[in-house]
């Protein structure tokens, strides 16, 4: 990947030929700026553009790709599982309008907000340790292994959701002349869809590093939008006659709430165990950077600025020592360069902080 940077008209071919073009506002006109992907006011801003915003955007884009495949697999696989029960007759599990709005409305807002606003590590930490930029070179956020792990997780979640819902609803068979006491096809479908929508928000929440009121509004707004759409269509006979009165039946049924609670709980535990294991056994630079942002260093709680300053000062003074085994109390003494780490004395850090 090449980057071209210039400030004049003679730099336009170079900027357009490079994979990423950066134009600088200068005295030679706006041709370079108008032809570039990014524009900056001074050459000195290039460092922040690449190290901070470049890394943030790379991480957001990788997360966008993983999540888009995840949420589509989560909605498609239950339909595929249902095909075995329907003898592959072509019968859809989900009501058409709900299914079409799944991607464009019910799960779109949070990933858009996260793709624009999320920041895993503060600019000060990134600029203090430029090695964070190696995350892109080493494909820390997206490679084949990570992609297929997300697909495997989507498959496991889909199995839990579909078969939990199917077990809770039962077969719904009754004799001739008897009144139906079971839930029908679209009741099962909307139950399954509700769980998928809610847990997709929960799954993305696990990846949100910078949770703000905007993200909280987008998460809650997506779920609220689904419920409003469900209420509207199930009470509008001309629009959704197949699911007319659907919400009145489903929301009052025990199988709906049981399958919702247990499915989300089991899926949540699987994701939580995976994330916790990754943080404890194989922390990434992003994990360590967030710990430093929180003021934790070598198992001790310092102020945020004190922890970052102590780690930066000691890393410059000590150089890069050879790697050695981590302990649970030494996670944040690991330096972020090539698997090596810097051992920082607790006494020295506390003395310096005081």
List each language-model region with its residue ranges.
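Membrane-embedded transport module
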Residues: 1-3, 8, 12, 16-214, ...
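Generic detection of intrinsically disordered/low-complexity segments and helix-coil linkers/edges
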Residues: 96, 126-127, 250-251, 256, ...
């Amino acid at each position: 990947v090449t980057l071209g940077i210039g400030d004049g008209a003679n730099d336009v071919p170079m900027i357009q030929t490079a994979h990423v073009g950066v134009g600088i506002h200068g005295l030679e006109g706006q041709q370079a700026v108008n032809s570039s992907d990014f524009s900056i006011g001074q050459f000195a801003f290039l460092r922040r553009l690449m190290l901070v915003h470049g890394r943030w955007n790379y991480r957001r884009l990788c997360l966008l790709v993983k999540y888009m495949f995840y949420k589509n697999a989560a909605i498609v696989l239950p339909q595929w599982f249902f095909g075995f029960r329907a003898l592959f007759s072509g019968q859809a599990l989900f009501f058409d309008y709900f299914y079409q709005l799944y991607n464009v409305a019910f799960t779109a807002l949070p990933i858009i907000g996260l793709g624009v606003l999320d920041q895993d590590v503060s600019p000060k930490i990134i600029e203090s340790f430029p090695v964070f930029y190696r995350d892109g070179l080493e494909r820390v956020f997206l490679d084949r292994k990570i992609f297929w792990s997300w697909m495997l997780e989507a498959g496991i979640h889909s199995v839990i959701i579909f078969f939990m819902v199917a077990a809770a609803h039962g077969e719904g068979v009754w004799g001739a002349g008897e009144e139906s006491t079971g839930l029908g096809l679209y009741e099962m479908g909307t139950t399954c869809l509700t769980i998928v929508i809610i847990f997709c928000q929960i799954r993305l929440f696990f990846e949100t590093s910078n949770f703000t009121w905007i993200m909280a509004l987008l998460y809650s707004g997506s779920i609220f939008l689904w419920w409003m759409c469900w209420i509207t269509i199930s009470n509008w006979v001309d629009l959704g006659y197949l699911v007319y009165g659907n919400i009145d039946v489903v929301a009052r049924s025990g199988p709906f709430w049981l399958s919702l609670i247990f499915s989300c709980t089991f899926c949540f535990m699987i994701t939580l165990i995976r994330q916790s294991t990754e943080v404890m056994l194989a922390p990434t630079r992003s994990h360590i950077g967030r710990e430093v942002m929180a003021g934790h260093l070598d198992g001790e709680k310092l102020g945020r600025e004190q922890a970052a300053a102590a780690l930066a000062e000691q890393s410059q003074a000590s150089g890069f020592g050879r790697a050695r085994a981590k302990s649970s109390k030494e996670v944040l003494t690991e330096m972020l360069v090539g698997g090596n780490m810097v051992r920082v004395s607790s006494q020295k850090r506390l003395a310096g902080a005081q």
